[in-house]
Amino acid sequence: MRQPGIAYFDLNGLKKINDLQGHQAGDALIRRTAECILQAFGKKAYRIDGDEFIVIDRESGREAFHACVENALRAMEESHIAISCGISWRAERGNIDEQINEADKKMYLAKRDFYACKEHDRRHYWPEQE
């Protein structure tokens, strides 16, 4: 079975939006984020926590998967959504749990960098940046 591409997304600054603008604004942000991810990936995307989303793509090749990630990130950037993203792609080794953990770790690295360097609206890590 082909190993999937995994993309793990997490909103940056949702708590601040909820605190300053109210939970309706935060909910609207979550819905818009979901729309951007769904437009790029369709039924391969899942909301797994309040402001976290995961994509499990077993169908696309590496280049097409990366293009979908870029499309989702671009749509969020155009909507002024600050997001952290980590991805994992393994064509032949590992299992899906390892891939999800790898993507999750990369997402947290991106989130750490976002908060360390706030002039950036979003950051993401590709597997090649290890």
Model-derived segments and spans:
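Conserved long alpha-helical elements within nucleotide-processing catalytic cores of c-di-GMP signaling
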Residues: 1-6, 12-39, 46-50, 54-55, ...
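Gram-positive cell-envelope targeting signals
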Residues: 8, 20, 126-130
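Alpha-helix N-cap recognition
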Residues: 13, 61, 92-96
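Short catalytic/binding micro-motifs of nucleotide second-messenger systems
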Residues: 40-44, 67-82
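Short beta-strand-to-loop capping motifs
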Residues: 55-60, 89-91
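Catalytic-core segments of nucleotide cyclases and related cyclic-nucleotide turnover enzymes
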Residues: 66-74, 88-120, 128-130
